């Protein structure tokens, strides 16, 4: 449909929608620009996407230079007195025996990354001196070599290397900044008795300078210059002209692709092809029918999308378009309550505390080693708490700000797309019908259907009971529970901050959705009091209908399996069935029987009767052997 047709269909709202998308894009660009500046200022730019994409341009020439350096050391082909970098390289070759390719990659990548980190820290001139950068490269190489040597050290002790590497990688990945990653690795190695390589700063300076020399010769990225710092003339590094321009272009490209997806104020554009649908203007960027991030590389995506062109996706389009056409409004009762909770410091209704956790007081100078250890342990705990708090608080605040932004509209909509499995998802993430408890509680349907009788209130009551944690009793009992607590429900709706029964009874799982139910149920009771019955009451509260282990529901339905069907609530039953409890009970019975009557583990044997071993040299247990049960 053309611009003119959309304008004729939606009038001024279409213009407003385009303006909203344009503003959202500007906000996304500004946010990314600040993020990129922060990364550079904190000395983390060398590990990012831009650095990786630029390093590959001169990878081969730099790698060739480093290879020659490694071979020179390996063949001991150096005349006269050897510099200290030579002996450090010998250490590295010993550690990376039979892994020279890995070592050469490490030298190139670490060298470039550290140089870029230092040179783009624009506010710190001392970080650009040759000696500072050289030492930084030496330190980074030592850290990598220490980890590799630590693994070798642990292997000689018979450690489970697969678990060790996995746990180290996971713990390092969980830490945000490189300094925290390094601190963790060093502490972990020290605890296991590994002391590390004995490299001096002087030697690391010389090694780093040699790596810099090789990288300058292999690329136009950096140049050596003399700079006046304080009263001295000092050798410094600067980025070359090509590198500076290339970095700027890459940043500009990233920023131009930045986008923030928000709800729309008119029905989203209907999907008509894998690339046409959802938004109308600036938010169309990075929006497509199918989420293909999981496929990885560009070629895989191209292959997949070319095959999509040959498939009839009419049913997919129709499904998504129907979901997109569903109008919502902001639940202002919930929004106002959440704003009050947030303004008063949080810690209610799933809103995290808004004030930072207090840091520990400094230890006295005469603190014992045990007190220092305990202090560090507590400090780490507080740091983790604070990081989690900030993350939750930010997510909550973004949802509130988005809801405030759209509270004035009489209808809002959510563009949807699907993942590669065909599962449907709303594209906006700050606020959506598939979000967390707070996000869901902030949304009402814009249109409702009047109830025909008192019987129609049944599912509203069941929904309320479910949110309060009473979802395992019969429907009749759930309805009775709601009716017995009508006074509590009304009091909660009238004074949510003063009368916190709604929060206590929801057991912390769905507090805000339960409060949204309280608001709706109070309106229902007011209608009944005024009209004598529920007929004509219009409810717009979304009611949750969740599947029970939906994969097994599909299997049970396809196989006409009555036992499985009952366990996953496909067959009518007075009480809700819990497949997980059913399976757990059966397994527990087998485990008790095995403990009392079972045999020792049986092991797999080959045709010669010898016990087969796994990759770690342990006997392979005969899984599924009936004698075990």
Residue locations for each model-derived region?
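Non-catalytic nucleic-acid-binding interfaces of large nucleic-acid enzymes and RNP effectors
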Residues: 1-628
């Amino acid at each position: 449909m053309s611009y003119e047709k959309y304008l004729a269909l939606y009038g001024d709202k279409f213009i407003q929608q385009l303006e909203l998308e344009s503003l959202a894009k500007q906000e996304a660009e500004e946010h990314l620009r600040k993020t990129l500046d922060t990364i550079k200022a904190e000395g983390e730019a060398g590990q990012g996407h831009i650095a990786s994409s630029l390093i590959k341009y001169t990878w081969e020439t730099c790698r060739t230079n480093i290879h020659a350096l490694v071979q020179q050391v390996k063949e001991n082909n150096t005349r006269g007195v050897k510099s200290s970098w030579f002996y450090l390289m010998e250490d590295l070759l010993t550690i990376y025996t039979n892994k020279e390719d890995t070592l050469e990659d490490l030298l190139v990548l670490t060298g470039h990354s550290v140089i870029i980190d230092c040179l783009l820290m624009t506010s710190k001139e001392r970080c650009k001196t040759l000696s500072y950068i050289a030492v930084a490269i030496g330190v980074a190489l030592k850290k990598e070599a220490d980890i590799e040597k630590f693994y070798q050290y642990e292997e000689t002790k018979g450690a489970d290397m697969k678990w060790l590497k996995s746990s180290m990688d996971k713990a390092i990945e969980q830490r945000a900044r490189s300094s925290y990653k390094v601190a963790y690795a060093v502490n972990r190695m020290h605890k296991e008795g590994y002391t590390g390589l004995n490299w001096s700063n002087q030697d690391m300076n010389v090694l780093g300078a040699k790596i810099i020399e090789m990288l300058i010769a292999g690329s136009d990225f950096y140049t050596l210059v003399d700079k006046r710092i304080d009263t001295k003339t000092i050798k410094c590094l600067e980025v070359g002209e090509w590198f500076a321009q290339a970095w700027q272009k890459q940043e500009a490209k990233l920023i131009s692709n930045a986008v923030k997806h928000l709800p729309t104020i008119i029905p989203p554009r209907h999907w008509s092809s894998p690339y046409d649908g959802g938004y109308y203007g600036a938010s169309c960027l990075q929006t497509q029918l199918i989420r293909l991030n999981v496929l990885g590389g560009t070629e895989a995506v191209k292959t997949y999308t070319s095959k999509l062109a040959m498939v009839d996706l009419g049913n997919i389009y129709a499904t998504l378009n129907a979901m997109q056409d569903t109008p919502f409004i902001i639940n202002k009762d919930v929004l106002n309550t959440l704003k009050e909770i947030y303004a008063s410091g949080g810690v209610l209704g799933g809103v995290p505390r808004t004030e930072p956790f207090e840091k520990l007081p400094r230890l006295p100078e005469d603190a014992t080693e045990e007190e220092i250890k305990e202090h560090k342990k507590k400090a780490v705990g507080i740091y983790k708490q604070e990081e989690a708090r900030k993350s939750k608080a930010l997510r909550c605040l973004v949802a509130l700000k988005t809801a405030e932004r759209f509270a004035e509209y009489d209808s809002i909509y959510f563009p949807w797309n699907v993942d590669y499995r065909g599962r449907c998802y709303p594209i906006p993430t700050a606020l959506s019908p598939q979000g967390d408890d707070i996000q869901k509680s902030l949304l009402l349907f814009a249109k409702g259907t009047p109830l025909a009788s008192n019987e129609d209130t049944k599912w509203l009551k069941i929904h309320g009971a479910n949110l309060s944690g009473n979802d395992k009793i019969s429907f009749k009992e759930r309805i009775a529970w709601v009716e017995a607590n009508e006074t509590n429900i009304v009091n909660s709706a009238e004074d949510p901050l003063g009368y916190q029964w709604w929060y206590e009874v929801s057991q912390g799982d769905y507090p805000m959705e339960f409060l949204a139910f309280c608001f709706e149920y109070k309106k229902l009771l007011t209608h009944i009091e005024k009209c004598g019955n529920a007929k004509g009451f219009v409810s717009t509260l979304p009611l949750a209908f969740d599947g029970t282990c939906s994969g097994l529901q599909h299997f049970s339905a396809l196989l006409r399996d009555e036992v499985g069907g009952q366990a996953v609530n496909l067959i009518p039953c007075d009480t809700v069935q819990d497949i997980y409890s059913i399976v757990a009970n059966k397994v527990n019975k087998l485990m008790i029987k095995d403990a009392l009557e079972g045999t020792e583990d049986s092991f797999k044997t080959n045709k010669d009767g010898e016990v087969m071993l796994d990759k770690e040299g342990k006997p392979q247990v005969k899984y599924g052997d009936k004698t075990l049960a």
